[in-house]
Every structure is written in C-alpha cells, then in structure tokens.
C-alpha cells in the first residue's frame, strides 16, 4: 500500500508493518524498534545480518534524550547542538550513543552503542511524532545494492512486501 497520510503510516508501524519513506538522503525502511518480528522482516528483506545494528530515527530531541544521560556534559552539548543548531541541522548527523536498558538487543546488534539521528526531514519528523517515538531506519535496498532514491526504486526492490509513505 502507498499512503500519503502520516497518521495511517504511523498506524502501520504500530501494527508491526515495515514502511519505506523518504529521508534526508535516500529512502529508508523503518519499523517499530520494539517489535522484534517487524525488525526481523527488515533484516530478511535486506538480507542483512543482525550483528550490524541499525539507526534509530527520532522526530525531536525529547524522544532520545534518555540516551544522552550518561554522556559527559561537553559531549552531550555537542550532540544536542548538532541536532538543534540552525546551521548544523542543514545536514543529518548520526551519533553512536551508549545504549540504555530500554534499547532492544536486536537494534544495536553486537555493539554496546546505538546509532541515533534526530531527523530534519519534515515528513520523517511528522512520522516519528505521530508514531510517538523513534523508529528503526535503514536504507531501502537489499544488501549490496544501491539505496533507493525514489518511491519507484524502493518499489522495484520490495514491491508489495512492504508499505510506502509518499510525500
């Protein structure tokens, strides 16, 4: 299914579906990070090993603030500034942060850290906010293939195996 409704897309995520959506650079695949079956579906679609881990994509700082608590104040300020400073937000910055006890093991793979980005893409911001928190994000492509740059390319890779959020 292809939808342009943020609320419908958020509901699909809550129901355990995998969703393709545009991000700052390429199309991404996402799911509810706490739904292990949805996450497993992404790994199978991409032919990706679980050990690699994925990015958590947030709509605003508050959705991932708990992951900043263990950072030294100087580092925490640097991370926050990269996500909130007007000039810095013109590019997407992903940080590796200490995973707390709330981050499922399947998200971080074999690593003690988790990749986190507070998105600046308006559609992704709305999607995360409507979902009610951060979501899984990984490029929309099978491992070894070029990431999808459009809805059409994502659809060529995954056709009716997933749902799509179009702008």
Where in the sequence are the language-model features?
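Active-site-adjacent structural elements in enzyme catalytic cores
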Residues: 1-167
